[in-house]
Structure formats: C-alpha cells, structure tokens
Amino acid sequence: MEYLKLYTLANNQAVIATNNERRFYSYDTCVCVYDYDKQEFTLSENESHFSRTTVKWLNKFLAGYDTTYQSIKKIARRENLN
C-alpha cells in the first residue's frame, strides 16, 4: 500500500515522499519540497499526476496554518504524516 510521508529536514525544508519503492527519502521517491519563502509546496523534478494532485491538496490543506518549520513538524505529527 502506497502512502505519503512528510520529512522535516535539518536545512529547513519539508519533503513529501512516498514508499512506492520501499525506500525513504531519496531522489526518486521525493514528491515535493516546501518553499518557506513562497509558503507553498513545489514539485520535485520527477513530476507526475500523483505529485501534482498532492501539491494542490497540501497547499490547500496548509492554507490556514502558520507554516514555519516548527509548525510543519507539528502539523505532520497531528495529521500522522510523520
């Protein structure tokens, strides 16, 4: 079963990845990266319909939140994404 996982990285990035290849954060499992300047998720280079839909949903979901690095971690824990 495929699922999404939100990784909050030490360099103030949040990365959404999938487990579709049974690997955790790596180039080819990365779906999108959170841009703290734009305050939105952007697609990684391996764009697909799945990741476009995911990015739209995530940006809509996070629209009402304070999306600082720490709050992204809290949202992830509360929503069981992390």
What are these model-predicted stretches?
Residues 1-82:
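Terminal leader/tail segments of proteins
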